[in-house]
Regions:
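A structural boundary/capping signal
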Residues: 3-240
């Protein structure tokens, strides 16, 4: 037991060192899948990540198969929806609290969603973004108060993807009316494209909240500090 405890402590230190480097990296240097699996192992040191990586590989291959060399916006977004929701069966979890966060802590993490195929706005969006990074598709995370969605953005071609609604597309005006109060509409953070690093910053805020709710205050502070360092203009981070 003491050896296992020592190994866990060593792994924890190594994971935290790697995560602490993220604010200093360029987005192009960050592997989103690898980082999200690190965060999952930080939560559950016994986690086996190979089956999770295999699941992502299957999704990536399915998107490639659905695309068949098409590169127009409609074909790309359709291929993503088909692979993630229709074929693999990923859905919005029905067990959520008043803010829309899963009551099952595991479903706040990538591993929990990949195992149950149920997630919430943030990690369902992250699934799109992982595939986007693997296939060089211009996808971006888009933040709102208590919500997060995906935007395909290639110059003049732009389409929003609502991961909690089977990949349905809604205009920016829909999100503005639904999620932004009058004082938030001029905020420079909301409804803007986030790069990979900024997206992780938004996710770190949510992870900090999970640890805080589980009375792990030091770990909560660790993630919230990272979040604030990456996204200082995010109100959500400051509120948490």
């Amino acid at each position: 037991p003491s050896l296992a405890l020592s190994l866990n402590t060593t792994n924890e230190i190594l994971i935290e060192k790697e995560l602490e480097n993220i604010p200093d990296l360029k987005s192009s240097q960050i592997d989103l899948l690898k980082t999200l699996l690190l965060i999952s192992r930080h939560w559950d040191p016994s986690l086996k990540t190979q089956p999770l990586q295999d699941e992502i590989k299957k999704l990536v291959l399915d998107v490639k198969h659905n695309l068949k060399d098409s590169n127009d916006t409609t074909s790309i977004t359709h291929a993503l929806r088909m692979a993630i929701h229709n074929n693999a069966g990923y859905r919005y979890t029905e067990q959520v609290d008043s803010r829309g966060y899963p009551t099952n802590n595991e479903e706040l993490f990538l591993h929990g969603m990949l195992e149950t195929k149920r997630g919430y706005c943030m990690n369902l969006s992250l699934l799109y973004l992982i595939i986007g990074q693997k296939l060089d598709i211009p996808l971006f995370g888009v933040p709102l108060p208590n919500h997060f969605f995906v935007r395909y953005d290639k110059g003049k071609d732009q389409i929003n993807i609502e991961a909690t609604e089977m990949g349905t597309s809604f205009p920016d005006s829909f999100y503005g009316q639904r999620y932004l109060g009058s004082s938030e509409k001029d905020n420079l953070y909301f409804l803007k494209n986030l790069n990979t690093k900024q997206t992780l910053g938004a996710y770190f805020s949510n992870i900090g909240m999970v640890y805080y709710q589980n009375q792990k205050v030091e770990r909560a502070i660790f993630y919230l500090k990272l979040s604030t360092k990456i996204n200082p203009s995010s109100i959500d981070t400051q509120n948490n």
